[in-house]
């Protein structure tokens, strides 16, 4: 147990590095997802499409879950970077595939059907939970 403030803050550089890497990977994953699967959805969100916002919110949470798992399980920054990248790539591939398989739901979400957006968001979160659970290295 640390007895002084400097002792308590000894791990601050590791925290800052860890947070920086996690935010970088999160931003990279979301940018790739938007570029590959959801570019049009961002415009729809800007226009007030609640269904698209619900779907994108699920995707954001779905990306954060496996990344958080990689952060928690990593013993070093390099491991976090590698496994965080693996987790985000897996999430991106699965979500892109699901959007192709569920293309009619994607279309109805883009048409403003909130139920479709909520469902697609829930699928993204569910995939993120499974992805996070599989990071048991």
Regions found by a protein language model. Give the residues of each.
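Interfacial loop-to-transmembrane junctions
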Residues: 104-124
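Juxtamembrane boundary at the C-terminal end of a transmembrane helix
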Residues: 130-137
């Amino acid at each position: 147990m640390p007895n002084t403030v400097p002792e308590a803050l000894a791990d601050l550089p590791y925290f800052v590095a860890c947070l920086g890497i996690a935010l970088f990977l999160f931003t990279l994953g979301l940018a790739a997802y938007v570029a590959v699967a959801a570019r049009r959805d961002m415009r729809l969100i800007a226009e007030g499409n609640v269904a698209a916002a619900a779907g994108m919110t699920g995707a954001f949470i779905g990306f954060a879950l496996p990344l958080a798992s990689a952060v928690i399980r990593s013993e070093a920054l390099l491991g976090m970077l590698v496994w965080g990248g693996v987790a985000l790539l897996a999430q991106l591939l699965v979500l892109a595939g699901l959007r192709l398989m569920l293309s009619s739901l994607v279309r109805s979400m883009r048409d403003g059907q909130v139920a479709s957006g909520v469902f697609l968001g829930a699928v993204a979160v569910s995939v993120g939970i499974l992805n996070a659970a599989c990071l048991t290295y």
